[in-house]
UniProtKB/Swiss-Prot annotation:
Zinc-finger among keywords: no
Organism: Marinomonas sp. (strain MWYL1)
Record has Metal-binding as a keyword: yes
Catalytic reaction(s) noted: adenine + H2O + H(+) = hypoxanthine + NH4(+)
Entry GO terms, CC: cytosol
Family stated for the protein in its record: Belongs to the metallo-dependent hydrolases superfamily. Adenosine and AMP deaminases family. Adenine deaminase type 2 subfamily.
Protein name listed in UniProt: Adenine deaminase
Transmembrane feature ranges: none
């Protein structure tokens, strides 16, 4: 009899919460650093790999920004994105929705067009090669000002045909969604979808703000929404999808043990939880690893596995005919 892990590897999957800068494997980071003559703090690939064994958020962020520092040219963004797409294609991921953080690159003097052209070309090539579809989400860094977000939006305007949605990420505590209310209104007026990281470290109130003030189409993380019964009902009433990241939660100590992960509880409550990898190179795994961690840790059932995969398809921003196609494939596999 086929195991759940084998089934999870075969099933068509979507990834809705993925930071492209978080897919930087140590070998590739080192190679691009050498290509661009950027000096890293680490003299060998092995030394760099050792740094990936961080135990706190600050060490992770230090390493994350080191990685960003080597991305200088369009080819770098293309190579980074293509390596991720090739990896997840091998894991039966059929559709991806990718965040990129332009402000983190603009502050280093790397132009907006350099970033987006490299990423978008890779997304196009993945569709030509494998039929993998995608959406691109420009994310604002919440520790920066609303003014900086508006400036970034202006730079994005010539490229809006390539951008499908707007996100909000980085250090959550002390930077509530309402800080960016006006810029999100401007984005919605341009016809862009909106999502926001909320309720990972921040309080349930941040999730309320994302829903009621920003009017998000989706919630990224959302774990702490479970602390507020009225909030759970509000999320269900709006039929919002939660993009949950199990291994990220474990690595950043949002949960202390995978057996305590709230995703089973989310499903039991009728919430549209999905499985995603967040920053897979840093958090110990891509999509198959995240599903395996839930199967082994939380003992999800076959029905729950199906529901998670289904939620990933229905909660995506892909076109309806593609949703129907992938749902048909999913049903056939679980029949």
């Amino acid at each position: 009899m086929e195991t759940l892990i084998e089934l999870s590897k075969k099933m068509p999957k979507t990834e809705l919460h993925l930071h492209i800068e978080g897919t930087f494997e140590p070998e590739q980071m080192f190679a691009i650093a050498q290509r661009n003559q950027v000096e890293l703090k680490y003299s060998t690939v092995d030394a760099l790999k050792a740094a990936y064994q961080f135990t706190n958020l600050q060490d992770f962020l230090d390493l994350y920004y080191q990685g960003m520092s080597v991305l200088l040219h369009e080819a770098d963004f293309y190579d980074l994105t293509m390596a991720y797409l090739e990896k997840v294609h091998s894991e039966n991921v059929v559709h991806v929705e990718i965040f990129f953080d332009p402000q983190g690159h603009l502050s280093r003097g790397v132009g907006f067009d350099v970033q987006i052209q490299g990423i978008y070309k890779a997304l196009q090539d993945a569709e030509k090669k494998w039929g993998m579809t995608s959406k691109l989400i420009m994310s604002f860094l919440r520790h920066l000002s609303e003014e900086s977000a508006f400036e970034t939006l202006e730079l994005a305007k010539p490229h809006l045909k390539w951008i499908d949605g707007i996100g909000l990420d980085s250090s959550e505590v002390g930077h509530p969604p309402e800080k960016f209310l006006r810029v999100f209104e401007a984005c919605k007026n341009l016809g862009l979808k909106v999502t926001a990281h909320a309720g990972e470290e921040g309080p349930p109130d941040y999730v309320w703000q994302a829903i009621e003030q920003i009017g998000v189409d989706r919630i990224d993380h959302g774990n702490r929404a479970l602390e507020d019964n009225k909030l759970i009902e509000a999320i269900k009433q709006r039929n919002l999808t939660l993009t949950v990241c199990p291994l990220s939660n474990l690595k950043l100590c949002v949960v202390n043990d995978m057996k305590n992960h709230p995703i089973k509880n989310m499903l039991a409550l009728g919430l549209n939880a999905t499985v995603n990898s967040d920053d897979p190179a840093y958090f110990g795994g891509y999509m198959n690893d995240n599903y395996a961690s839930l199967i082994n840790g939380t003992r999800i059932s076959k029905e729950e596995l199906f529901q998670l995969a289904k939620n990933g398809i229905t909660g995506s921003w892909m076109e309806d005919h593609l949703k129907e196609l992938h749902l048909k494939q999913l049903h056939a596999l679980f029949a």
